From Swiss-Prot:
GO terms for molecular function: rRNA binding; structural constituent of ribosome. One of the primary rRNA binding proteins, it binds directly near the 3'-end of the 23S rRNA, where it nucleates assembly of the 50S subunit. GO terms for biological process: translation. Belongs to the universal ribosomal protein uL3 family. The gene is rplC. It comes from Lysinibacillus sphaericus (strain C3-41). One of its GO terms (cellular component) is cytosolic large ribosomal subunit. The keyword Ligase does not apply. InterPro entries: Ribosomal_uL3, Ribosomal_uL3_bac/org-type, Ribosomal_uL3_CS, Transl_B-barrel_sf. This is Large ribosomal subunit protein uL3. The lineage of its organism: Bacteria, Bacillati, Bacillota, Bacilli, Bacillales.
């Protein structure tokens, strides 16, 4: 069954494997999450657990939110997410979910919001090639052809300049290099989406080989 936890991306560093290989890793700090609700097929139509991450001040939450977390005997949470395909019987409302649910060598999917880049052209946004920079081409970083003459319009999905970044992206099949239970850290091989201190969702890989 699947497992999941919420955390924050701290940054990147590198560690050495036993054979001397240098492994770039992303450090994710996942302080204990709290199970706020168990959803079942009978009551909600599907099975899932709802977890909360990071306390926030009571004055920043309304009465329904305060009542919801009171059932778990915890403080209001800044982030609340659901994890499906989990064994609901293993969890109880108010239980803490810690990094120790994962082990070294586990394969995971990490979801986050990519860094916002603002308004960008087609070369940076879509990786298109630029035109010649000399010999009077007068065509350097422009989008290029908008399409054939016949339809008298530009087709949808045409790659054009525009807002880049700020998208929800999942990177699949990342390997956990180390689990530090004392400091609530996960060291994940490779990079994960988002800026430093960004919220990330770590869960068991859905397409693990």
């Amino acid at each position: 069954m699947a497992k999941g936890i919420l955390g924050r991306k701290i940054g990147m560093t590198q560690v050495f494997a036993e054979n001397g290989d240098l492994i770039p890793v992303t450090v994710i700090e996942a302080t204990p999450n709290v199970v706020l609700q168990k959803k079942t097929v009978e009551t909600d139509g599907y099975e899932a657990i709802q977890v909360g991450f990071e306390d926030k001040r009571v004055k920043l939450s309304n009465k329904p939110q305060q009542g919801h977390v009171a059932k778990a005997n915890t403080a209001p949470k800044r982030f609340i997410r659901e994890f499906r395909n989990v064994n609901v019987e293993e969890y109880e409302v108010g239980q803490e979910v810690k990094v120790e649910i994962f082990a070294e060598g586990d394969v995971i999917d990490v979801t986050g919001v990519t860094k916002g880049k603002g308004f960008q052209g087609v070369i940076k946004r879509h990786g298109q090639s630029r035109g010649p920079m000399a010999h009077g081409s007068r065509y350097h970083r422009r989008p290029g052809s908008m399409g054939p003459v016949a339809p008298n319009r530009v087709f949808k999905q045409k790659k054009l300049p525009g807002q880049m970044g700020g998208n929800v992206v999942t990177i699949q099949n990342l390997e956990i290099v180390k689990v530090d239970t004392d400091r609530n850290l996960l060291l994940v091989k490779g990079n994960v989406p988002g800026s430093k201190k960004a919220l990330v969702t770590v869960k068991t890989a859905s397409k693990a080989k």
